[in-house]
Amino acid sequence: MPEHGTAFDTPRADGNGVRAKTLRGLLVARELDTARLARSLTTRELAGQMTMSPAMLNRVMTGRRVPTALEIGGLCGLLDIDPARRPHLYRLTADADLTEWIIRPGAGTSALGAIEEVADTATWLDPLLIPRPLRTAAYHHALGHPIGDHQSPEPAAPPTDRFLLHPRALTHPAIPADVMGEQLLHLCHTAPNTIRLLPATFPPHPGFRVLHIDHFPPVVHIDHHGTHVILESPDSTAAHTTLLRAATTAAATAEHTRRTLTDLAARTGTVG
């Protein structure tokens, strides 16, 4: 619930609706503001303890202003941020002006997880494979991943992701027919209203997803053989967001997609 009492109790957006300058700044702001709320502090009260104006602290808590090294240290102390967590926030603060991310294999996925956590929804587009959130464990294993590396998801309620699949993704030479049939059935029953098929004539494009974050431009995530590339600058995401709009316009309805998937599953002998 919003706090009451001062004009700066709850961080506010700029007039254009975009708060944070960069995604790193947004992650810092969200973590600090979550800690502030956990301690039941208004921004005015915290600003007083930091000897900052409420307006200045409000900009920090929305990511519109990156805290200095001294300020982030003081905020972590006052908000009782876990000491083991502080170096991560210090790094994000130091790199807050950067607008692209490359997370290489072995580097961990905590940064990606943090970005996913602040996203409200995501839209996936994949021309060749079933996106990971929709895969059965058997399908994932057939692609060469270790057993136990993936669990078949339960139907999502409420669904927050949307999926645009190219027909090419519904066949794969490495996937046995029975596994693909099970996968097709799984698509029919797992969040069926979130999946839409593209026409076969739609030009294939390397897979990606667009993360939609409140009060922030669309963020593009590309998984390139385990290396995660994250783009946030509108200049660098424009080609992907334009393609996504075109794909969304061209895609079949969810109902038509569900019928198509059911028919394909029936041809494999898995419907009964």
Cite the ranges covered by each PLM segment.
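Interdomain hinge/linker segments and adjacent boundary elements that couple functional modules
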Residues: P2-A38, R44-G48, P54-A55, R59-P173, ...
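C-terminal regulatory/effector modules of DNA-binding transcriptional regulators
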Residues: A177, G181-G272
